[in-house]
Amino acid sequence: MENREISAPFIGIVRHRLATDGKGVTTLVAFHGCPLRCKYCLNSQCLDSKMVWRTITTSELLDELLLDNLYFLATGGGVTFGGGEPLLRSEFIDAFCRIKPAEWKINFETSLNVDRSHLERVLPHANEFFIDIKDTNPAIYKEYTTRDNVQVLDNLRWLLGHEGVAERIIVRLPHIPNHNTQEDVDRSRAMLEEMGVKYFDEFDYMVKEEVITSKK
């Protein structure tokens, strides 16, 4: 396929992350835009169109990330796409992965609440997925995010149906103040284990106040 120059809105870059999201040193590329409206959004600037840092092209991003090339090669690290919801920028990511050095690992921090076509586009490039599942209970998920989670679970089943992909998935199970309990988290974990998920990151959301976001 011919390499194409594509642009995408993004918030910024966080360099030299270690033991945060995959092996080696990684650099986070945070895109603007998200389908969810979480009550305790940890990166609410991704929802505000006035706070887009800038639009970047695939070649411009490559130039930015080549500054970290020695770290990636020395540690087996690479790029983590986050946001916001990075899978909404799957066309951009696909184009970027066609021009990046082959040695760079590609990871995703995602909610999986996107159309299947986005996953199909990025799966050939993905080394690891860090999936923020929120909660598998549909009522809890919708109350917290304002969205349904049917697509999330369907996409997770689809990923797990690919040979070897379960070894590259880490599901994040948050304790969300005022929204779920330890019993809810345990129930989610049991359901996900039954689906074939092997690796989990269970943690507490540390929040100061509820984020007021639009449901549009």
Where are these regions (language model features)?
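Conserved radical SAM core fold
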Residues: 86, 112-119, 129-145, 178, ...
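Conserved Radical SAM active-site core
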Residues: 11, 25, 43-125
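A general structural detector for well-ordered alpha-helical segments in enzyme core domains, enriched
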Residues: 95-96, 122, 151-158, 184-191
